[in-house]
Amino acid sequence: MSTSQYERFKEQLIEFHTAFKAPIARSFSEARQDQCALRVNLISEEYAEYKKAEDRHLVIDGLTDTLYVVVGTAITVGIDPMVVELPPPPVNPTPFKSLFDGQIIGLVRKLTERVLCYRGLLSHLTEVYHKINQASVNYGFSLTSAMNIVHASNMTKLWSANEKDHLMAAAGELYTFEPSGIPDRYIIKRKLDGKIIKPPSFVAPDLLSL
């Protein structure tokens, strides 16, 4: 785990947030507390998917999706986790899925406080980021490769004009839409909770090779 690795992940999430017009806080003074409920939902949902996954590619998908929303949370509150070097993986390791419920719960609690605490968020973001990296080592796959695949997939969540018009005609009362940060592409969100909805042209990540 290195600073350059995190910076690459951060660049990917900035690209995603720019395309989907999600908040990007350049420092803690720009932290978007109004977005914290959504961040909590995303983190909880993706970590739950990771916990229940059994097949290898689904475990990798769940862990990488958890990292994706955690890094997205970091740029939403303007705090970069501290990078901690991990020991090298053992030769011929036996893969196992490691859990980190306590760290996830701690981060969620900090995100739901009435007043956001810089030190508390920094500590818990760092712990979760470290645990995700350690979990990828324990399970025996490249987190960087997985993030590249998942990020490419996530960028296909933008809707074409034809896809958007078809959905809004069929069930427009359930969704909102707006132009994205990319020309001729649209963002569709569920009104209930603001979650981004995938278009028919969405390309799922293929993690079977990892």
Label each region the model flagged:
Residues M1-L210:
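Flexible "arm" and connector segments at domain edges
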